[in-house]
Amino acid sequence: MAEFPVEPFKIKAVEPIRQRGRGERESILKDAGYNLFAIRACDVYIDLLTDSGTSAMSDRQWAGIMMGDESYAGCRNFFHLEEAITSITGFRHFVPTHQGRAAENILFTCTVKPGDSVPSNMHFDTTQANVVARGGRPVDLIADEGLDPTFRAPFKGDIDLEKLEAFIERTGPENIPLGMLTITNNSGGGQPVSMANIRNTSETLHGHGIPFFLDACRYAENAYFIKLRDRGYANAPLLEIAQEMFSYADGCTMSAKKDALVNIGGFLALNDDSLFQQVRQELIIREGFPTYGGLAGRDLEAMARGLWEGLNEDYLAYRIGHTRYLAERLLEENIPILEPPGGHAVYLDARRFLPHIGQGELPGQALVCALYLEGGIRSVEIGSVMFAHEDPETGQMIYPELELVRMAIPRRVYTQAHLDYVVETCARLYEKRDEIGGLAYTHAPELLRHFTARFEPV
């Protein structure tokens, strides 16, 4: 029987939510072109679209907001943030950005030229799009076990080091401006990356003179998994684990909207002095002066405080346990999910949930729509809509190995009753899964199409 962790906090403020009737939801879904991104938040009952920017901030963060210094240059909150980032990551330089994709944009603008390739365990959507927008090629080299939804391994987010070495030899280091690891691996089920894999990836890339960056959105959750699953780190403080992870890299991008527990914010941190000068100039053009980076001083303060809160062991035990509870309850109902559960979300395996729908008819998106229709739950497809693409040489559609529906859990927001409701809805839907049909595009933008695409039932 799944056990629910006791929350290490008290609730001081609440926000009302309201369930729409099934007839209303049918109309809402049709008007939105069967894209849950186009649905108003007030029409959603349980919102599991993303854990990005949807956290409940603490009283300490809210108190910090009242201390916002809105000076254009040199606000005190910048230096509080600098102290937090330097202490945790050890990188010499950083710039704040309004969110993670802005940090990616600046990094790739300064490093990637047309024809370059950027390897990773698995790029997430905005990372992939930012590489492509610069004329580069994002390449996923996840270990094979990470593509098997039912295989249980402690670190399924690891990059395949043999694939990485072969890729470098085949492509040439001169055509690889940097390599990356996404920790935890969002596209692959929120799975953690082991310390050994981070270290060995660093050695492989540096052995060829290639810089190494981390996509560190969920670095704290990754550090906690290392503490849980690697006996060599069982007694290590989480801060020291995080510091070691960052020590192997030359820099990182981060959306602070995840493990820094804020509603807006991000940063790009790095060691290279010359690259930092380019980054800072690009930041001024795109985001603003280097001591605010497109953010108000109050947001910088909330981010500084949230970075420390996100490393709290009691909080992370609750956070990971919260997600594990939802996963175990779903497994008790024999609902197919990606195993073992990751840190920030539970991923339904749409190909096993809806085996009668081929990838060309978008089973993940069909399941997303069915979840909303059945229970007012908003989730997101991470499969063919997000990642399928046309082979430029053959014109054939290349589909991803994984066809997932991510139910991302906002931090410190939902209770056990909310998660039980999600389980009950999924169980009802699974019983009548044969009634769910596929979808087809009526509008599909070239980049990041999942945000604005429109669909119709097949």
Feature roles, as predicted:
Residues G21, S58, A366-L371, A427:
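C-terminal, active-site-flanking charged/polar segments
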Residues I264, H344, E403-M407:
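Short amphipathic alpha-helical segments
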Residues R286-G288, G375-I377, C426-D434:
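A common structural junction motif
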Residues A2-Y34, A38-A41, I46-A56, Q61, ...:
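Conserved PLP-enzyme active-site core in the AAT-like
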Residues G68, T253, R406-P410:
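Short glycine-rich or small-residue beta-strand-to-loop segments that form or flank ligand, phosphate
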Residues M386-V458:
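PLP-dependent enzyme catalytic core of the Aspartate aminotransferase-like
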Residues F276-Q277, P355-P363, R412-Y421:
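Short, conserved charged micro-motifs
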Residues T291-C369, L373-E401, I436-L447:
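Conserved small-domain helix->loop->beta segment predominantly found in fold-type I
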